[in-house]
């Protein structure tokens, strides 16, 4: 039987601090060098980049500190990112999916021919994002929900979007309820 060489896309969801990025990093480590080339993609990176542009324009940006990619700063000022994201989705509900789709297409188009490209989307939050990528990518999509005991939604926006996805459980393939130490073991089994 021939080996599956169709591009692979992991869409990882879960509440803030559930271990999505840790799981993606473990998958990247697992796939790279094993006949695959993996790269992490995030819907929210473009949002954080534009928020950082505002900080730069105001003369207060400081990499790693006053920076929306820095965890502590992001958590403290999450409200701005939530409102900006909500506003942009009001303009076009697929705005972030459309942007990420273009990034993944570029990754797939330029992947070496002798490797299987693996896109790891570590911040999937909305059902329409899955539906958009499933429609526009010729890839095998694997969805994963990360659950971490003791952690719940960071805000109402996160709670609502996760509830919408859970109502459409037929699209979820895998639900992982593991502590961060167990993530590496699970990733190595994929």
Residue ranges and their predicted role:
Residues 29-39:
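Post-Walker A helix-loop "phosphate-sensing" segment adjacent to the P-loop in P-loop NTPases
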Residues 20:
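Conserved lysine of the Walker
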Residues 13:
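Residues at the beta-strand->loop junction immediately N-terminal to the Walker
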Residues 23:
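Hydrophobic positions on the alpha1 helix immediately C-terminal to the Walker A/P-loop
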């Amino acid at each position: 039987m021939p080996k599956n060489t169709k591009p692979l896309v992991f869409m990882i969801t879960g509440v803030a601090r559930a271990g999505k990025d840790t799981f993606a990093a473990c998958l990247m480590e697992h796939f790279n060098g094993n006949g695959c080339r993996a790269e992490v993609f995030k819907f929210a990176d473009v949002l954080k980049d534009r928020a950082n542009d505002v900080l730069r324009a105001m003369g207060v940006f400081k990499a790693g500190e006053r920076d929306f990619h820095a965890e502590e700063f992001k958590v403290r000022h999450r409200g701005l990112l939530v409102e900006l994201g909500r506003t942009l989705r009001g303009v076009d509900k697929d705005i972030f999916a459309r942007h990420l789709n273009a990034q993944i297409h570029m990754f797939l188009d330029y992947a070496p021919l002798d490797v299987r490209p693996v896109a790891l989307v570590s911040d999937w939050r909305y059902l329409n994002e899955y539906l958009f990528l499933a429609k526009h990518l010729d890839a095998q999509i694997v969805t994963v929900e990360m659950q971490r005991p003791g952690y719940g939604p960071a805000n109402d926006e996160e709670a609502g979007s996760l509830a919408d996805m859970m109502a459409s459980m037929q699209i979820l393939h895998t639900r992982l309820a593991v502590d961060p130490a167990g993530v590496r073991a699970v990733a190595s089994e994929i």
